[in-house]
């Protein structure tokens, strides 16, 4: 890949999010203070793959890249993001991670990987609040990219400018939200119920 760098402040480093050694090497080259981290690396699994087409090895690789990759990066850079002012961490996810919005099914590995990324992020925010780090899970929209295809309704500049605007609204109070590029808060799932085996079902007296 070739880049034309017009801004001398921009530096480009190679990074393999599946490799702890690569992530650590990148972290060692990174500035001592980081105020914004955008985890954008990801792969698709073939959008319309059905149940019979699931390949175990490829599914695990998709999950490793899309879910664990960003966690590796956050771990490696955490010390440089924890300082006296707010640091924003953006996890690029997808509406396809929403359990409530899984109307068409398929894309098993991609959906599962992004749902796992969302849960990793919500769990990490609990620890990061005390270190002045705010997380946001971003859905960039269905964008006209190599992955999104020509039928996608959202242009790249619109998606990017929208996500930049969302980042300006981040605080420790709204950390961990699942937000679309236009600012809409997205659903996690239809209902959240905690069931404890052998105990009473809350507010019903039922035992399960």
Predicted regions and their residues:
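Short, flexible catalytic-loop segment of classical short-chain dehydrogenase/reductase
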Residues: 140-146
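Rossmann-fold cofactor-recognition segment
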Residues: 5-21
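C-terminal helical subdomain
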Residues: 137-138, 149-190, 194
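Catalytic loop of short-chain dehydrogenase/reductase
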Residues: 43, 50-62, 71, 82-129
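Conserved Rossmann-fold cofactor-binding substructure of NAD(P)-dependent oxidoreductases
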Residues: 18-33
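Conserved hydrophobic beta-strands of the Rossmann-like cofactor-binding core
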Residues: 37-38, 42
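Short-chain dehydrogenase/reductase
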Residues: 27, 74, 121, 160-163
